[in-house]
From Swiss-Prot:
GO terms for cellular component: nucleus. One of its GO terms (molecular function) is RNA polymerase II transcription regulatory region sequence-specific DNA binding. PROSITE patterns: K_BOX, MADS_BOX_1, MADS_BOX_2. Keywords: Activator, Coiled coil, Developmental protein, Differentiation, DNA-binding, Flowering, Nucleus, Transcription, Transcription regulation. It comes from Citrus sinensis. Its main location: nucleus. This is Floral homeotic protein APETALA 1.
Length: 256
């Protein structure tokens, strides 16, 4: 009885998967070498493991030449095929490509919002969770950076305001000091020891020359009394001082 067809599917056991990869890789490299020797063909083989490790094989170790040749051929083939292609077909392919991209973006957006999660496998959910955690870390980092910059800006403004207040306070103190010095100098000038006190405003008026000769002043009368404040006595004394000497003089003349 022959052996049945083995169903191709992913090997879940990690160790078995690694062993199978090593065996199949060795067989694949052997087949590439055989075809290059038997058929005189230029062969280039590139294999990446699930961990990202590179395995390659090329005829006569000329991988770069084979890749350059492949690139030139692909570019030339595209240039030849492009003019012959139908324009409508290109637009249809572009439309389908963009439509598929839009559907993928919409599905990812729903997943990010926590919607349509029933059809996702545990591995897909784990990947989605990791993406959301990474996005949250970026968001928190950016938010903290903005808050830190805002705090620094506010601290700079506060420092500038404090410096301005200190400068204004010093200016006010200096002006008060100057004002006090000027006030003390003014008081010393107005209240000096050799300067009489200022007169009231009405006494600073200029008097008429006639009034200078009619100011009351003290004098003696013939009776020997000192008169100063009585106006009637002043008039009487004026008369006595004026006429009595004349009368005495006349009497003396007659007696002689």
């Amino acid at each position: 009885m022959g052996r049945g067809r083995v169903q191709l599917k992913r090997i879940e056991n990690k160790i078995n998967r690694q062993v199978t990869f090593s065996k199949r890789r060795a067989g694949l490299l052997k087949k590439a070498h055989e075809i290059s020797v038997l058929c005189d063909a230029e062969v280039a083989l590139v294999v990446f493991s699930h961990k990202g490790k590179l395995f390659e094989y090329s005829t006569d170790s000329c991988m770069e030449k084979i890749l350059e040749r492949y690139e030139r051929y692909s570019y030339a083939e595209r240039q030849l095929i492009a003019p012959e292609s139908d324009v409508n077909t290109n637009w249809s392919m572009e439309y389908n490509r963009l439509k598929a991209k839009i559907e993928l973006l919409e599905r990812n957006q729903r997943h990010y919002l926590g919607e349509d999660l029933q059809a996702m496998s545990p591995k897909e959910l784990q990947n989605l969770e990791q993406q959301l955690d990474t996005a949250l870390k970026h968001i928190r980092t950016r938010k903290n950076q903005l808050m830190y910059e805002s705090i620094n800006e506010l601290q700079k403004k506060e420092k500038a305001i404090q410096e301005q207040n200190s400068m204004l306070f010093k200016q006010i103190k200096e002006r008060e000091k100057i004002f006090r010095a000027q006030q003390e100098q003014w008081d010393q000038q107005n209240q000096g020891p050799n300067m009489p006190p200022p007169l009231p405003p009405q006494q600073h008026q200029i008097q008429h020359p006639y009034m200078l000769f009619h100011q009351p002043f003290p004098f003696f009368n013939m009776g020997g009394l000192y008169q100063e404040d009585d106006p009637m006595a002043m008039r009487r004394n004026d008369l006595e001082l004026t006429f009595e000497p004349v009368y005495n003089c006349n009497l003396g003349c007659f007696a002689a």
